[in-house]
Design a protein with these regions (language model features):
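Helix-to-loop junction immediately C-terminal to a conserved catalytic motif
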Residues: 48
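ABC ATPase NBD coupling module
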Residues: 65-81, 105-110, 224-228
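Conserved signature/switch motifs of ABC ATPase nucleotide-binding domains
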Residues: 132-135, 152-153
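Catalytic Walker B motif of ABC-type/P-loop ATPase nucleotide-binding domains
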Residues: 158-161
Length: 324
């Protein structure tokens, strides 16, 4: 369990985190998203004790670790496993030795550390690669070693900082599936820092949007998607830009956000309203978190009927905007 209360961090008069409140229940996969400069990196450093907050508290598994130093801080850090964008493995060591390394540093006997590393090699699907050095491994395999290394101390929390942004789409899907499986098998809490909304759509149970050091929105993925007109939902379900239209084009364009119903129901409503849809200019429709969600942009020549359709859809709880 992770709880942040009023977390604030300033650097030479610049506010990186501005009073963040956040609670993540145990066993969830929670995404932290935001553009560059939103405060994601500073948040990570405060969570891991690499930065001391200017004010506020960080509670990890019931312990306020904000003021911890020395041995108490090192012990608290062992409850958090870190997975980075690049695994940063030691080139001189084998995959097995890289996984065992944090245990050896922590004072665990080498025989015990290597036994734990062998268990983790199997857990992350790298049997047969134990004696390979990093240069002999693919990017996805190196990331699996990094994940295994993060789990060496049996942490309760796995903190993943852009874990797939350096990988191709196929390998990304495999690594995300592995993280989800590890959560299911080990019961750990996973915090994923990412700018890739596809990662959130794929495996997150809940998500937080950071902007200018503030928590702009936190909710379960299903709650976010049930409000498809929200800022976060628009990020998760983007539409392509509208094509440039002729100044004399008299068609009316509606942007429709869908949650919990199909595109066919929208077209059925249009037909009953007598609205001649000229063109579907763009559409994004998919099933996420067990919910059919999407957005579409339609164009029609009948302004009056189109606006009547918009009102009908709005009455049914569907968000509709007239696009410029």
């Amino acid at each position: 369990m992770i709880t942040l209360k009023g977390l604030r961090k300033e650097f030479a008069g610049t506010t990186a985190l501005d009073g963040i409140d956040l609670h993540v229940e145990s066993g969830l996969i929670h995404g932290i998203v935001g553009r560059s400069g939103a405060g994601k990196s500073t948040l990570i450093r405060c969570l891991t004790g690499l930065e001391t907050p200017t004010s506020g508290t960080v509670v990890i598994n019931g312990e306020d670790v904000t003021a911890y130093t020395g041995a108490r801080l090192r012990k608290a850090r062992r409850s958090i496993g870190m997975v980075f964008q690049h695994a940063e493995l030691l080139d001189s060591k084998t995959a097995l030795e890289n996984i065992a390394h944090p245990l050896v540093i922590a004072g665990v006997k080498k025989k015990q550390a290597m036994q734990r590393a062998r268990e983790l090699i199997t857990l992350v699907g790298l049997e047969g690669r134990e004696d390979n050095h990093p240069a002999q491994l693919s990017g996805g395999q190196r990331q699996r070693v990094g994940i295994a290394r993060a789990l060496a101390t049996e942490p309760k929390i796995l903190l993943c900082d852009e874990p797939t942004s350096a990988l191709d789409s196929t390998t990304t899907a495999q690594i995300l599936a592995l993280i989800k499986q590890l959560r299911d098998d080990l019961g750990i809490t996973v915090l994923i820092i990412t700018h890739e909304m596809s990662v959130v759509r794929e495996i997150c149970d809940s998500v937080t949007l950071l902007a200018e050091g503030r928590n702009q929105h936190t909710a379960s993925l299903r709650e976010v998607l049930s409000d498809p007109a929200s800022t976060l939902a628009r990020e998760l379900i983007p539409l392509p830009s509208a094509p440039i239209r002729d100044a004399e084009d008299a068609t009316v364009m509606l942007e429709i956000s869908i949650a919990g119903l199909s595109a066919a129901e929208v077209f059925d409503a249009a037909q009953r309203a007598g609205t001649p849809i000229v063109e579907v200019e763009a559409a994004t429709l998919e099933r996420i978190a067990g919910l059919d969600v999407g957005r579409m942009r339609i164009r029609s020549t009948d302004a009056q009927a189109t606006r009547a359709l918009g009102r009908t859809l709005t009455e049914r709880g569907i968000h509709v905007e007239e696009a410029a």
